[in-house]
């Protein structure tokens, strides 16, 4: 746990290591739904949907994105996944409403450590990004730019109630995520961005949670001397459903058999006592 905390603190101050020559700041609202369905002991399905506003919180939409994929559970703590991500967004270097489509393949491994009052979740993701080329502020070009991107995320979920992580209770949530670009078309911004989030998680039911708080993002743009600060209100609905059949049928059947056996034993004992009483009354 100590190395994770050190890393968490280290990357929180990472932006100070960069020379911020031209910095722009924006304020947005991020809304999202993250769902995960588990079909069996090893297989599941993941689906995400996100909407982000433009600058100053309410000036239109800057991005709509969705992600789907298959999930394989190695065990209850480790899982791997792969799938497809699509985004339609207004490029950050342009102010006019030209939307740039992005098609991305992704592969991920995630693992968790659960304690009575603290859950730590970590993940590492590899992405293959195809983004539509842009000619100018109002027109897309032909073809796509391509690059790889890696993402490492560490999240701390701290229960605040007497019975943490139960329905109608709050937990504090903190996470950091580091993004790195690489590929032939990456010249200046190998470091892509850092995201830091602080907020709360409200457990609605055992399957549903509402996560809300403040998100800060520091990003280096494709032009090497340009940086971007993002301040966002982030509100996500999280839904996890386990569709595996519970082991209640066998337990109930065993209970029924045991109950029937006990009932039969009581009946036999009653019959024996009746016969014995009749014999004693007749011959004694």
Model region roles, listed by residue range:
Residues 21-83, 87-90:
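Start-of-domain marker
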Residues 25-29, 62-64, 101-105, 144-152, ...:
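Residues that define the transmembrane beta-barrel architecture of outer-membrane proteins
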Residues 33-37, 68-72, 107-111, 152-162, ...:
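Residues on the lipid-exposed face of transmembrane beta-strands in outer-membrane beta-barrel proteins
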Residues 41-42, 77, 114-121, 160-170, ...:
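Short loop/turn motifs that connect adjacent beta-strands in outer-membrane beta-barrel proteins
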Residues 45-47, 78-82, 118-124, 150, ...:
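Transmembrane beta-strands of outer-membrane beta-barrel proteins
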Residues 49-55, 84-90, 113-115, 126-130, ...:
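Transmembrane beta-strands of outer-membrane beta-barrel pores
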Residues 109, 229-283:
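Outer-membrane beta-barrel "beta-signal"
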Residues 125-209, 218:
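Outer-membrane beta-barrel transmembrane domain signature
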């Amino acid at each position: 746990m100590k190395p994770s905390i050190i890393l968490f603190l280290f990357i929180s101050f990472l932006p100070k290591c960069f020379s911020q020559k031209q910095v722009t700041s924006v304020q947005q609202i991020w809304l999202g739904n993250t769902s995960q369905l588990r079909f069996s002991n090893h297989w599941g399905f993941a689906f995400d949907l996100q909407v982000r506003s433009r600058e100053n919180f309410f000036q239109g939409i800057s991005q709509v994105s969705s992600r789907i994929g298959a999930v394989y559970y190695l065990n209850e703590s480790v899982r791997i996944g792969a799938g497809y991500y699509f985004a339609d967004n207004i490029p950050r270097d342009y102010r006019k409403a030209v939307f740039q489509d992005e098609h991305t393949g992704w592969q991920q491994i995630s693992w968790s450590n659960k304690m009575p009052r603290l859950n730590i979740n970590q993940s590492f993701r590899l992405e293959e990004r195809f983004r539509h080329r842009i000619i100018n502020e109002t027109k897309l070009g032909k073809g796509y730019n391509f690059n790889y991107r890696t993402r490492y995320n560490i999240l701390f979920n701290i229960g605040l109630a007497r019975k943490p992580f139960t329905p109608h209770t709050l937990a504090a949530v903190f996470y950091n995520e580091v993004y790195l670009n690489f590929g032939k078309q990456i010249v200046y911004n190998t470091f892509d961005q850092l995201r830091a989030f602080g907020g709360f998680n409200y457990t609605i039911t055992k399957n549903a949670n509402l996560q809300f708080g403040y998100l800060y993002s520091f990003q280096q743009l494709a032009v090497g001397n340009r940086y971007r600060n993002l301040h966002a209100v982030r509100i996500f609905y999280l839904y996890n459903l386990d569709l595996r059949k519970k082991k209640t049928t066998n337990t109930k059947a065993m209970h029924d058999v045991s109950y029937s056996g006990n009932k039969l034993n009581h009946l036999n004992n009653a019959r024996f006592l009746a016969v014995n009483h009749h014999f004693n009354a007749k011959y004694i």
